[in-house]
């Protein structure tokens, strides 16, 4: 045999599969079955229905995923009314939450929210007191040359509004003025189509009343809108930019929007007869700051809104008399502030007595005259002073007011036989407290609101940085300073001389905090105002077009409103909140369908469920 053939045979035998040995001769790494601890065998076959018999069971109870009931008074964000009730029931050992308990805790919940506002006021002021928008609103210090005074342009703007209102009053324009009742309000879809034509709406719709429509036209006349004004732009910068334009009558700013990157809206009001095209060219391109240039547009007012209903208690005889006194005081306050004639209240009352149309109505209440007079007084404050009486909020212009309440208010008839609810009493009490903050600030319990008088606040801060170490050893603890002195009076002199910047900052915080808590409609942290967890998430996200959480969709009240919470949640979230009663046809858009995404007009197929 050749040598090559022999090598191939060896290679073949190397990879050739040999026959397995006998079972008794096979080698195994495991010991034989007879020597093992147990005899291995196949488990018996089980029937189809008993395969759970020999399975091990979970030990112990299943874990619960409910959130713990934390004390709301220890948190810096608001909790919902339902969660507050559950915590209250647990703390007071109430076994079940009944409907009576649900309706009786409005006062307790309102006290909790007032305490929350007081606890978070100082931290909010300290974080925003150095911003321009906050300084313009609350920092009043004559030693620093900061005095809040009304400009001559604004006085002339108010005088023009006053003259227009009085001319209409003398011409009989307000002789039949009356707020719509709840029966007059026509229900419309909450989110109407954008293609809806206002001209096809019913003529008796309160939104299209002559007073409301004329108010809209007056607000948008000779006005341009500048959106997204940054918070670091001060009123002085706007004055320097616009005062040099001869045909600019007045400008106004909206309240700051803490959801939309602290942005504001600016409205520029021009004198009558101004060419708006030329005015737009003159205003556009003006640089207010290094990072902001004016780009104006036509003003906008929200549409498709309902009048906000006022609580029934406002129409009772005693409440109406008290509100009339407050209305007259607010009218006198506006006359003094804007240098207007002080006979407005008397002229309105005389006109209503002599020329008001009195329709025959059997259901007319006994205080019908007082109700109409109070409504006309409130309309005067709304049109001239741009002051919303029912929310105690002051605006800089009429168009700024219409952004929050474009359709005004509606009244409910008071039923003497009906018991006044706790929610209405709370609303009236809060309204009177807001009036006191504006009319009698010296009589307000400022400590309960989270502030102190300016001098007391400064003294408390000085005492907190003066540490007594021995009988004649007092140390300064301002920042990194650690100097020793013989007495506290020497430490105070040292702080006045060496730490003047720190002392000026403390004084600024004290002044701003005092004015901030006395403002009934002050801007607050959204997590303090809103109980929606969605709002807590979007605070750390850039603005992507969310609706303003602070907008008033129902009558503003400090008590709980389930509808208001749902609207806040749906407004702050980009996804619609789920409702169990919602029909399937409205939720169809959330389900995936096998339609052509390139065909936007393709209809959703009808599926047989």
Curated annotation (Swiss-Prot):
MF-aspect GO terms: lncRNA binding; zinc ion binding
Region listing for Disordered, in residue ranges: 1-60, 187-210
Keywords from the UniProt entry: Metal-binding, Nucleus, Phosphoprotein, Zinc, Zinc-finger
Record's compositionally biased regions (Polar residues): 201-210
Residue ranges covered by zinc fingers (C2H2-type): 474-499
Feature: compositional bias, Basic and acidic residues: 1-25, 37-57
Keyword Phosphoprotein: yes
UniProt GO BP: nuclear polyadenylation-dependent CUT catabolic process; regulatory ncRNA-mediated gene silencing; regulatory ncRNA-mediated heterochromatin formation
Compartment(s) where it occurs, according to its Swiss-Prot or TrEMBL record: Nucleus
Listed Low complexity bias regions: 27-36
Residues bearing PTM Phosphoserine: 28, 30
CC per GO annotation: chromatin; MTREC complex; nuclear body; nucleus
Family: Belongs to the ARS2 family.
Subunit structure: Interacts with ccr4.
The protein's name: NURS complex subunit pir2
Organism of origin: Schizosaccharomyces pombe (strain 972 / ATCC 24843) (Fission yeast)
Gene designation: pir2
């Amino acid at each position: 045999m050749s040598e090559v053939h022999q090598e191939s045979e060896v290679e073949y035998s190397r990879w050739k599969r040999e026959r397995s040995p006998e079972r008794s001769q096979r080698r195994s790494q495991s010991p034989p079955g007879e020597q093992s601890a147990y005899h291995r065998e196949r488990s018996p076959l089980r029937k189809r229905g008993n395969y759970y018999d020999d399975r091990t069971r979970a030990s112990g109870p299943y874990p619960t995923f409910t959130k713990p009931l934390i004390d709301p008074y220890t948190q810096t964000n608001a909790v919902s009314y339902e969660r507050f009730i559950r915590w209250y029931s647990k703390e007071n050992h109430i076994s079940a939450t009944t409907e009576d308990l649900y309706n009786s805790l409005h006062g307790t919940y309102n006290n909790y929210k007032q305490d929350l506002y007081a606890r978070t006021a100082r931290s909010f002021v300290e974080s925003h007191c150095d911003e321009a928008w906050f300084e313009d609103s609350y920092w009043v210090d004559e030693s620093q040359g900061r005095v809040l005074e009304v400009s001559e342009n604004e006085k002339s703007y108010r005088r023009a509004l006053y003259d227009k209102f009085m001319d209409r009053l003398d011409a009989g324009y307000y002789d039949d003025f009356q707020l719509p009742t709840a029966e007059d309000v026509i229900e419309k879809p909450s989110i109407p189509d954008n293609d809806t034509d206002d001209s096809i709406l019913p003529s008796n719709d309160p939104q299209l009343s002559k007073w409301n429509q004329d108010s809209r036209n007056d607000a948008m006349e000779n006005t341009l809108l500048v959106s997204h004004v940054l918070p670091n732009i001060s009123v002085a910068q706007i004055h320097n930019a616009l005062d040099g334009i001869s045909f600019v009558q007045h400008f106004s700013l909206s309240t700051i929007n803490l959801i939309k990157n602290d942005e504001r809206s600016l409205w520029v009001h021009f004198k009558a007869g101004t060419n708006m095209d030329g005015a737009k060219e003159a205003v556009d391109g003006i640089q207010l700051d290094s990072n902001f240039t004016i780009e104006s547009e036509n003003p906008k007012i929200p549409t498709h809104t309902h009048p906000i209903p006022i609580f029934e208690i406002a129409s009772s005889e005693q409440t109406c008399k008290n509100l009339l006194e407050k209305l007259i005081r607010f009218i006198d306050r506006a006359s003094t502030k804007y240098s207007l004639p002080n006979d407005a209240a008397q002229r309105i009352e005389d006109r209503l007595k002599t020329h008001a149309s009195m329709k025959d109505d059997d259901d007319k209440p006994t205080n019908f005259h007082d109700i109409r007079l109070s409504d006309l007084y409130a309309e005067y404050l709304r049109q001239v002073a741009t002051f919303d009486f029912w929310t105690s909020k002051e605006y800089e212009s009429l168009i700024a007011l219409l952004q929050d309440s474009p359709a005004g208010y509606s009244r409910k008839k008071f039923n003497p036989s009906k018991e006044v609810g706790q929610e209405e009493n709370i609303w009236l009490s809060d309204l009177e407290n807001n009036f006191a903050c504006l009319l009698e600030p010296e009589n307000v319990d400022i400590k309960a609101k989270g502030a102190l008088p300016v001098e007391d606040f400064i003294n408390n801060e000085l005492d907190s940085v003066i540490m007594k170490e021995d009988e004649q050893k007092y140390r300064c603890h301002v920042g990194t300073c650690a100097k020793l002195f013989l007495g506290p009076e020497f430490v105070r002199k040292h702080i006045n001389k060496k730490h003047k910047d720190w002392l000026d900052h403390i004084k600024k915080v004290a002044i701003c905090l005092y004015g901030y808590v006395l403002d009934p409609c002050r801007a607050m942290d959204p997590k303090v105002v809103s109980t929606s967890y969605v709002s807590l998430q979007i605070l750390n996200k850039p603005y992507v077009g969310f609706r303003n959480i602070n907008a008033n969709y129902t009558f503003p009240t400090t008590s709980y409103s389930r509808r208001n919470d749902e609207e806040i949640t749906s407004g702050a979230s980009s996804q619609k909140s789920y409702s169990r009663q919602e029909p399937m046809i409205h939720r169809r858009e959330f389900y995936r369908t096998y339609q052509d995404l390139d065909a936007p007009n393709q209809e959703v197929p009808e599926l047989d469920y």
